[in-house]
Amino acid sequence: GLDKSYILEYNFGAGEGLSLFIPNAKGGAGGPIGNDEKAMGYVEDYNYSEQIAQSNHYWGGQLFSGGAIYLGAVAFFLFFVALFLTKDAIRFPVFVLAVLCMLLAAKTGSLNHWFIDHFPMYNKFRDSKMILVVLQVLVPMMAILFLDKLWKEESLQGDKKFHYGVIGGTVLIALILFAFPSVSGSFITAEEVKQFGEYAKQKPEQLGMIDGLKTELIHVREAIYKADAGRTLFFAFAAAILLLLAMNKVNRYLWLGLMGLFVVLDQVNVDLRYLNSDPIEEGSEVLEK
């Protein structure tokens, strides 16, 4: 089979699972920060502008990233709430499967190594993070199941206080992720830490400048993270309000229509980061292929 380090090159690093509902939790797609005009606007010390512009927009654990595997802030919010509030027994195997998918998508951990060593054909996969395809089915499935329960006004797990507690607690988690960026992990990769250390050894007289660059890079990446964490908080809060309306028997066409609108706005807004309206010109590289 393939070498373990080779198999896990594109698996999630620490905290990268947050990118499932915070697209830029680890910077999104790889590439120079200078290509992102908004990100460059976060630079405070312009003495480091050139170096920041050349730094990688992505700081996760994968060898390279073409963009986050984004499931949606609204969809993930509904999924999380559904695990607590639906009475269906299916929520238990769904929860176990979701946790298993996250563990197998991670770069570290003994579970992945056990699967590589013992599970038939598992060591033939180049990117075991593909297991997240299962999560891409589970999240919308549970979200739709939960909305169906609300639409039909079926009973939910627990009383109203429990319902409000789960919804409020989920929004609180989004608030904590926004207010405390360090919860997501480091904003400097292990390779960058190594590079900064080597620069400091080679040019000790420039230690102040090196530390300043490192601090500025962390600041810019924190700002990139917070922009999307704030976005997720907004959608979580909006979804929470709509759930409260649904639970209080407000016109179901209204809350369901608005929920659908927020899902579309949430997804399309992120999709457009990787698409543009530029026409494909005749004779371009894409057409030639």
Predicted regions and their residues:
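Contiguous transmembrane helix-bundle modules in multi-pass membrane proteins
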Residues: T86-E288
